[in-house]
Amino acid sequence: MKVLNLGSKKQASFYVACELYKEMAFNQHCKLGLATGGTMTDLYEQLVKLLNKNQLNVDNVSTFNLDEYVGLTASHPQSYHYYMDDMLFKQYPYFNRKNIHIPNGDADDMNAEASKYNDVLEQQGQRDIQILGIGENGHIGFNEPGTPFDSVTHIVDLTESTIKANSRYFKNEDDVPKQAISMGLANILQAKRIILLAFGEKKRAAITHLLNQEISVDVPATLLHKHPNVEIYLDDEACPKNVAKIHVDEMD
């Protein structure tokens, strides 16, 4: 596991955007696992700049989002469908829509939708890169504490802490969906390479638990210790004291 403090959200996001761009440039049929939320805004902003500057052919790139709120239509401003369109797919409108995969949070039968999305993940094979954030309680995707390590795509009852943390995106806390559909932990670990981003003081405790705690369902992110190729990029505020700062120009 590689852990790097790049000083700021902007610097870390730029570095990871370059990693995604290189993957798409050198592997035109690559498969990317994508994440959403406030952590990822600078990442997509930087990636869009790189794509527009170089007019990269992404017609054969496939994307797979981690999760979606249950009960929100794709057109809802707080849905992750809307987020991805707003942050990436409308900003660089050359991705092939048939290769964009995001769980449907408004399906009539959500358990069937979870099974369907899991089938897509299995049929498409390993993602080349999986992008992750981390929740204040150590969740990855929407896999809350207590989620079995062998879980696959499933419907999640969101914890009070997650609902509270996400309420800043809604008019009030009561508007936050109480469930989500999420890739399971086993799905996440199937990726060839995992890149986790964490920014801000509120994420420091979760990162500290991830780095120092034994693998436990109480902190789902600790499962990443079982994966052979994990990179964690932090800013100063999220970084535990024992991780030294490094500048992007010092990296290979």
UniProtKB/Swiss-Prot annotation:
The active site is at D67, N137, H139, E144. One of its GO terms (cellular component) is cytoplasm. Its EC number is 3.5.99.6. InterPro entries: Glc/Gal-6P_isomerase, Glucosamine6P_isomerase, Glucosamine6P_isomerase_CS, NagB/RpiA_transferase-like. Pfam families: Glucosamine_iso. It comes from the Bacteria. It catalyses: alpha-D-glucosamine 6-phosphate + H2O = beta-D-fructose 6-phosphate + NH4(+). One of its GO terms (biological process) is carbohydrate metabolic process. One of its GO terms (molecular function) is identical protein binding. Gene3D superfamilies: 3.40.50.1360. Keywords: Carbohydrate metabolism, Hydrolase. CDD domains: GlcN6P_deaminase (cd01399). Pathway: Amino-sugar metabolism; N-acetylneuraminate degradation; D-fructose 6-phosphate from N-acetylneuraminate: step 5/5. Belongs to the glucosamine/galactosamine-6-phosphate isomerase family. NagB subfamily. Catalyzes the reversible isomerization-deamination of glucosamine 6-phosphate (GlcN6P) to form fructose 6-phosphate (Fru6P) and ammonium ion. HAMAP family: GlcN6P_deamin. This is Glucosamine-6-phosphate deaminase.
